[in-house]
Swiss-Prot record:
Signal peptide (residue range): none
Segments for region (Disordered): 1-88
E.C. code: 2.1.1.53
Induction (record text): Triggered by jasmonic acid (MeJA); this induction is repressed by 2-chloroethylphosphonic acid (ethephon), an ethylene precursor, that can by alleviated by 1-methylcyclopropene (1-MCP), a competitive inhibitor of ethylene receptors. Accumulates upon wounding and feeding by the specialist herbivore Manduca sexta; these induction is dramatically amplified by a pretreatment with 1-MCP.
Class in the EC hierarchy, top level: transferase
Chain intervals with Polar residues compositional bias: 1-14, 23-39, 46-88
Lineage top rank: taxon: Eukaryota
Originating gene: PMT1
Binding, S-adenosyl-L-methionine: Q130, E205, D236, G237, Y324
Protein name in UniProt: Putrescine N-methyltransferase 1
An example Gene Ontology CC term for this record: cytosol
Organism: Nicotiana attenuata (Coyote tobacco)
Keywords: Alkaloid metabolism, Methyltransferase, Polyamine biosynthesis, S-adenosyl-L-methionine, Transferase
A Gene Ontology BP annotation from the UniProt entry: response to wounding
Family: Belongs to the class I-like SAM-binding methyltransferase superfamily. Spermidine/spermine synthase family.
Length: 388
């Protein structure tokens, strides 16, 4: 493994009950413009709820400012309460619901929230780019949040990860060179290593704290960073793509945050143009693309941008993820001009033999040939809007 660092180490705030990572000092950090690009399994950029941990002797509150009614982010900090009564402050979050629960709020899904019971807080800190927290939940194992938004759950996030990898890579023959924008925890890399044809994987993660959390709490994932085919780059994902050699990659996977605030650029035409340039003829890209239940206006704009850039094919797929808003998430799958790519009919499906014998990984939990094909079948309301 080669590790290339293009950003500075983040400083981290630790309060009572948090578990500090080695090498970080107490202090504050400032958000930089690079936050929008190359984050790990991201859905951040929200006004997020945060819980209070366990029996919480001191209930933390958050006072909503008047701007909250207009979707602005003027909110007070939320807290987590611990059994010993100490409070752990999570900066930039909105109010919690009750002791022992993590709750996520966002202007992207107004009028609703998602909550998980917290068994144990494992880590909380602030990097140069975001608040990072990891806790053990009662239902889904370890839960990673960034800026108070759930990014991945150990026992419930596999549909998202398997689909964002196998929908594109299962649609092209023998992928060899792949780029992951984000992926600092390692779930996406874990799935990608199922393909014996792969010779090189570049991972661009902007936040070194996310990588450190992986090494400490997900060692079975972080071990894959040591694979000789893997280069881990700590830096800006959009800048990396822009500077990439033309026609170099067979596939690019974009694990981005939601297309609001600083992450908006990752869903607009200039970024997609850079991605298309970095792909070979007939190369493919897959990026997360929100929920059909809440974000059709966003999805239509993403599709319009992709249709202007990608001259091969442009497709929308979706799947179920229990810990994401509305329980579903979508994907944009596009190909550059060149050899035809039919995303709806995979030609390189991962089968049982490839998964368990050649790659020596555990069987897939969600993805299969039928799920791949079904992901492109949309409800009537979504199909009419997307195809219009």
């Amino acid at each position: 493994m080669e590790v290339i660092s293009t950003n500075t180490n983040g400083s981290t705030i630790f309060k009572n009950g948090a578990i500090p990572m080695n090498g970080y000092q107490n202090g504050t950090s400032k958000h930089q413009n690079g936050h929008q690009n190359g984050t790990s399994e991201h859905r951040n950029g929200h006004q997020n709820g945060i819980s209070e941990h366990q029996n919480g002797h001191k209930n933390g509150t958050s006072e909503h400012q008047n701007g909250h009614q207009n979707g602005t982010s003027e909110q007070q900090n939320g807290t987590i309460s611990h059994d010993n009564g100490n409070e752990l402050q999570l900066l930039g979050s909105s109010n919690s619901i009750k002791p022992g629960w993590f709750s996520e709020f966002s202007a992207l899904w107004p009028g609703e929230a998602f909550s998980l019971k917290v068994e144990k807080l494992l880590f909380q800190g602030k990097s140069d780019y975001q608040d990072v927290m990891l806790f053990e939940s009662a239902t889904y194992g370890k839960v990673l949040t960034l800026d108070g938004a759930i990014q991945h759950t150990e026992n419930g996030g596999f549909p998202y990860t398997e689909m964002i990898v196998h929908l594109p890579l299962g649609s092209i023959p023998n992928p060899k060179k792949v780029l992951i924008i984000g992926g600092g925890i390692g779930f996406t890399l874990f799935e990608m290593l199922r393909y014996p044809s792969i010779e090189k994987i570049d991972i661009v993660e902007i936040d070194d704290v996310v990588v450190d959390v992986s090494r400490k709490f997900f060692p079975y994932l972080a071990a894959n960073f040591n694979d000789p085919r893997v280069t881990l780059v700590l830096g800006d994902g959009a800048a990396f793509v822009k500077a990439a050699q033309a026609g170099y990659y067979d596939a690019i996977i974009v694990d981005s945050s939601d297309p609001i605030g600083p992450a908006k650029d990752l869903f607009e035409r200039p970024f997609f143009e850079a991605v298309a340039k970095a792909l070979r003829p007939g190369g493919v890209v897959c990026t997360q693309a929100e929920s059909i239940w809440l974000h059709m206006h966003i999805i239509k704009q993403i599709i319009a941008n992709c249709r202007q850039v990608f001259k091969g094919s442009v497709n929308y797929a979706w799947t179920t993820v229990p810990t994401y808003p509305t329980g579903v998430i979508g994907y944009m799958l596009c190909s550059t001009e060149g050899p035809e790519v039919d995303f709806k009919n995979p030609i390189n499906p991962i089968d049982k033999e490839t998964t368990q014998v050649k790659s020596k990984l555990a069987p897939l939990k969600f993805y299969n040939f039928d799920i791949h094909k079904a992901a492109f079948i949309l409800p009537s309301f979504a199909r009419s809007m997307i195809e219009s």
